[in-house]
Regions:
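Membrane-interface helix/loop caps of multi-pass membrane proteins
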Residues: 1-358, 367-369, 679
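Extracellular/periplasmic envelope-modification machinery, especially enzymes
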Residues: 231, 304-308, 322, 330, ...
Length: 702
């Protein structure tokens, strides 16, 4: 319940409830499996899987089906491919893996957040349920061979899992916090913690005077966690022990209640409070409430168009989720539980009925999982991009889809045929990234330790002795022009390199230790001395993502000076217009090319680079009129979609803009083109460095 309340009323803060949930899962299942294995020498796998299917998979499958149907009806078509992928992943209990694969970190709810994001923790739990029986059987087998008790052997194995996973979580947090938060390997220690509570329960008994203080302390630790700690940044590291130790204290306080004068057991007040009928009833609905609340929240935000949830919206989502959880418990969970429950005075299930029950349950489970796998196959077939192995615009009719080269006398979005659908298709747009981003050489956004390393993307074409080496560097806005540069490179014998870090522009930052962008800037200077490109191309201005006017980033000139001091020619490109909302989503939701366009008034009246103090020899190029012809921005130009999200250009539009980029470069940097090129103003000199004139390069030398 705490997880739900923090999601709805706490701006999505991590409450620690998931950590407690995982520990309780380990507590309950370890004890149950160990008792069965010790008694029978094995685990009745069909009964075990059938019980899981009835109690866990069936309600989850219902919510997944309902969420998928609602999402396909309500969410923009641009999000359908990811929706189906995550529905399949949730059904197969690998949603945490899908979120990592898709580079979607755990975050507070917003208009573009996945409605299946909360299934990551259920996926960790489901993977535990499939793996843990093998560990229990191993413990029983080892116990019989060594003469030790199964509980003692299991305790040793679980302690090993706990220690290994805890150390792995600690290590991986320093590499990638977003992945560490979602990975099963870094979460296993929390499940092992609960398992150890089950195995060592007999040793958790507290002296009577300590039980009530321990219960209050434990409850305080669990409840306060979400208010005190930033779980999204700290978990599953050592700070996750905060709520887990609270759980341990509560269990220790409840394990042996105090007794009155007549020897009647009396639990400490916090335990009695948690066992009251209303809370017990709410506990019956907890699983369904958790399943329903997140998709209800995301659908509510989509329907209302809100960026976040206010108090009124939170109440609406909570009431709906409670009603849906009650209905699920009443008509799904309870009937399935009764279906598999023992009957008759003996408390056992008739053997024939048990076999039919298990066959039916497992058939339903297998069918559900097969459906998930089939959905994934269809999804992959539908969303495979056609640009692999060639240009995104290869074979495109440029008469129908002129893109950026549409006639200057035509309005933005002009088409020879008004009925022509924009290119490319909006579905899967977010995955149509530039070529370099498909390789493991783009440094990710954020301040996770280890993200300061400069990763260099080599030219994707066959190695050759290029006439000039040109490096696109800085944030991703430098990289999204890659395809246009590659097109020109084929014609003019250039080598195109890319060195980017998401969200990081060139600027001077003192605190390198705690700011990975600052450290990346410093490392870039060292890399520049080693690689020595002839030209470095980087954005010169920036429009803040949360509003504000275009400007030069503070401290950028210092880094630009370092680049020219290293002997490279610097080319500054004016920043790309930015929209506050996702452009393909806007188009898919019924918006037109004008209403979904970036806000042109966020541009400075004149290019800030014109009056700025720049390093000697720096060249500048303004591509604003390429993205916003005639001073008017549009989401679709020449029947080609301009943006793949709110601020990155599509590969397709960038490729149509290559001729316009060449025109601009011939005006600004004619020395890039050799004497054989039309429009060249001077013959080439010997050596790549000598091709830069003194006027462009300034007084610097290599």
């Amino acid at each position: 319940m705490g997880v739900v309340l923090f999601h709805l009323f706490g701006d999505g803060r991590v409450s620690g409830g998931i950590d407690v949930f995982l520990a309780i899962s380990g507590f309950l299942f370890t004890g149950m499996l160990l008792r069965e294995a010790a008694e029978h020498g094995h685990i009745r796998i069909t009964r075990y899987l059938g019980r899981l299917a009835r109690r866990i998979l069936a309600p989850a499958a219902l919510v997944i089906a309902a969420t998928t149907a609602a999402g396909l009806l309500i969410l923009p078509t641009t999000r359908h491919d990811q929706l189906v992928a995550e529905a399949r992943a949730s059904l197969l209990y690998v949603e945490n893996v899908e979120l990592i694969r898709s580079q979607l970190s755990y975050e507070a709810a917003g208009p573009e957040t996945s409605p299946f994001q909360h299934f990551w923790s259920l996926s960790v739990q489901g993977q535990f349920y499939l793996v843990w029986p093998a560990l229990v059987l191993l413990a029983v087998w080892l116990a019989r061979r060594t003469g030790r008790s199964a509980a003692a052997t299991m305790s040793l194995l679980v302690a090993t899992v706990f220690l290994g996973s805890f150390l792995w979580a600690l290590h991986h947090q320093g590499i990638n916090q977003a992945e560490a938060y979602l990975m099963s390997g870094t979460r296993a220690w929390e499940l092992a913690f609960g398992s150890l509570l089950a195995l060592l329960g007999a040793h958790l008994r507290l002296p009577q005077p300590l039980r009530t203080p321990a219960a209050w302390t434990g409850l305080g630790l669990v409840v306060s966690c979400g208010f005190v700690l930033d779980g999204a940044a700290l978990f599953p590291g050592p700070w996750a022990l905060w709520p887990l130790l609270g759980l341990a204290l509560l269990m220790a306080a409840a394990s042996a209640p105090s007794r009155t004068a007549d020897r009647s057991p009396v639990a400490p007040p916090p335990i009695r409070f948690l066992a009251t009928r209303p809370l017990a009833r709410l506990g019956d609905l907890a699983y369904g409430l958790y399943l329903w609340h997140w998709p209800a929240l995301i659908i509510h935000l989509e329907l209302t168009g809100a960026e976040g949830l206010d108090a009124g919206g939170a109440v609406v989502v909570l009431v709906f989720s409670l009603a849906a959880a009650w209905a699920t418990h009443r008509w799904v969970e309870t009937p399935l539980a009764k279906w598999g429950a023992p009957t008759g005075t003996s408390g056992t299930i008739d053997a024939g009925r048990e076999r039919r029950l298990h066959r039916t349950t497992l058939s339903l489970a297998a069918g559900t999982l097969a459906l998930g796998a089939a959905a994934g196959t269809v999804h992959l077939q539908l969303t495979t991009t056609p640009q692999e192995g060639g240009w995104a615009t290869e074979g495109l009719d440029r008469q129908v889809y002129p893109g950026a080269t549409v006639s200057a006398s035509s309005p933005p979005g002009h088409s020879a045929d008004d009925d022509v659908a924009p290119f490319p298709d909006l579905v899967g747009m977010s995955r149509r990234v530039p070529e370099y981003a498909t390789r493991d050489c783009h440094q990710r956004t954020g301040d996770d330790p280890g993200t300061s390393e400069v990763l260099l993307c080599e030219d994707p074409r066959e190695p050759h002795d290029a006439r000039l080496s040109i490096m696109l560097a800085g944030g991703s806005h430098a990289g999204h022009w890659q395809h246009a540069w590659l097109m020109l490179a084929e014609e003019h014998d250039w080598e195109i390199l890319v060195a980017t870090k998401g969200g990081c522009v060139f600027r001077h930052i003192e605190d390198h230790e705690h700011n990975q962008c600052g450290a990346w800037n410093a490392d870039f200077a060292a890399m520049l001395d080693q690689r020595q490109p002839d030209v470095v191309v980087t954005p010169g201005t920036r429009i803040p993502r949360d509003g504000g006017e275009e400007s030069i980033v503070d401290g950028a000139q210092d880094r630009w000076q370092e680049i020219t001091d290293a002997g490279a020619q610097l080319l500054l490109v004016r920043g790309t217009p930015r929209q506050l909302t996702n452009v393909p989503d806007c188009l898919a939701s019924g918006g037109d090319a004008h209403s979904c366009a970036p806000e042109v008034d966020r541009f400075a009246e004149t290019d800030p680079l014109e009056d700025a103090e720049l390093p000697a020899g720096t060249a500048t190029v303004d591509l604003t009129d390429v993205v916003c012809p005639q001073g008017r921005c549009s989401a679709v130009i020449g029947n080609v979609v301009v943006y793949r999200d709110s601020h990155h250009l599509t590969n397709e539009y960038v490729e149509t803009a290559a001729p316009l980029l060449e025109e601009k470069l011939r005006e600004t940097m004619p020395q890039l083109f050799d004497s054989g090129d039309t429009g060249a103003e001077e013959p080439p000199a010997e050596g790549a460095a000598d091709r830069m004139t003194g006027a462009q390069r300034g007084d610097q030398s290599r």
